[in-house]
Amino acid sequence: MASSNLIKQLQERGLVAQVTDEEALAERLAQGPIALYCGFDPTADSLHLGHLVPLLCLKRFQEMGHKPIALVGGATGLIGDPSFKAAERKLNTEDTVQEWVDKIRKQVAPFLDFDCGENSAIAANNYDWFGNMNVLTFLRDIGKHFSVNQMINKEAVKQRLNRDDQGISFTEFSYNLLQGYDFACLNELHGVALQIGGSDQWGNITSGIDLTRRLHQNQVFGLTVPLITKADGTKFGKTEGGAVWLDPKKTSPYKFYQFWINTADADVYRFLKFFTFMDIEEINALEEEDKNSGKAPRAQYVLADLVTRLVHCEDGLAAAKRITASLFNGTLSDLSEADFEQLAQDGVPMVEMEKGADLMQALVDSELQPSRGQARKTIASNAITINGEKQADPEYTFVDGDRLYGRYTLLRRGKKNYCLICWK
């Protein structure tokens, strides 16, 4: 695929929400490799699924020979982006933000190639140019190029200005200037010609384009990817437990894999275009195959495999599939201690218990049963398994052999109701 066709390919995948001067950008891409960047503010100690589409777009550009720059906002993370936010963000300490910067840089690194010649990726931090800038320099060299009239008319902040209960502080109002200067600065340092980001960043991106033109007389471009929505109108990237994170300590590979397995049929083929590198033709063929097979669609498993491998590598995918298979067939012999740690983290409901507890008490404490009386009936009806083995004795008390790796016992009621006991 020719680099000049990259915008068209992104559009075919539904990955372009807005683009500035599409024709001129296509011409610029046709002339040869460019440098581009995407910013990631450290608003938490991990990126989440919402960051994955722009991050993978950086990867798509690099695979076509372009030079990606992942900018982690050590400075902008101290301020907070007000774009489309209903209320002022809580300001975090410098130490906290720096810790998050380090974590996010490490998280971004595996997606890009930092050692591949001329288009090797760069990791940047905007604290490098803002950290020692004084307020007079900021106001004279940056502020004078921004019209407050235009800033208050940007959709991203207009909503806040129009709310009686929530105004906007000067701190957050200034964010637009900071991100705008990032673009101008990266244009000067690395010849960056394109910024990509989520569609909520459009106002910040266009500010950067204007500022770069004013400061350096260079034409640069902006491209936004859509904010991902689900066909049923519910928010993408959320589970009952909250956001789906890229950090395995916050969302285990098993839970991550299950998130994709549970994708609705109405969303799955679109998500294959957004989150994987499968060819459009392959995705269309898979959709056709699923329609005509008369069986459960295969697409969810393809999606879960590809995205889990991208984020958690081969080992993470193997563990997720191993845990999934073990829970499905009821045999736990293949599970490692690390697999049980994933289950305890967020895979199934978990309860901590003292040794000496009996089965009835475990069912009540785990909320698999409402009372000891009901637990007794359920056990007697042969509906309970301990580590995959049926147990029909209501008076059963756990023994050391039930404690896998000396710590874990998996209870199941019926076919799908699990609880993991972690013994104290």
Swiss-Prot record:
Keyword ATP-binding (UniProt): yes
GO molecular function: ATP binding; RNA binding; tyrosine-tRNA ligase activity
Residues given in the record as L-tyrosine binding sites: Y37, Y175, Q179
Chain ranges for the short sequence motif 'HIGH' region as given in the UniProt record: 42-51
Function: Catalyzes the attachment of tyrosine to tRNA(Tyr) in a two-step reaction: tyrosine is first activated by ATP to form Tyr-AMP and then transferred to the acceptor end of tRNA(Tyr).
Record: residues binding ATP: K238
Entry-linked Gene3D superfamilies: HUPs (3.40.50.620), RNA-binding S4 domain (3.10.290.10), Tyrosyl-Transfer RNA Synthetase (1.10.240.10)
Any one Pfam family match given in the protein's UniProt record, by short name: tRNA-synt_1b
Keywords: Aminoacyl-tRNA synthetase, ATP-binding, Cytoplasm, Ligase, Nucleotide-binding, Protein biosynthesis, RNA-binding
Sequence motif: 'KMSKS' region, positions: 235-239
Family indicated by similarity: Belongs to the class-I aminoacyl-tRNA synthetase family. TyrS type 1 subfamily.
Descriptive protein name: Tyrosine--tRNA ligase
E.C. number(s) listed in UniProt: 6.1.1.1
A cellular component annotation (GO) from this entry: cytosol
Subcellular localization: Cytoplasm
Subunit structure: Homodimer.
Top-level division of the source organism's lineage: Bacteria
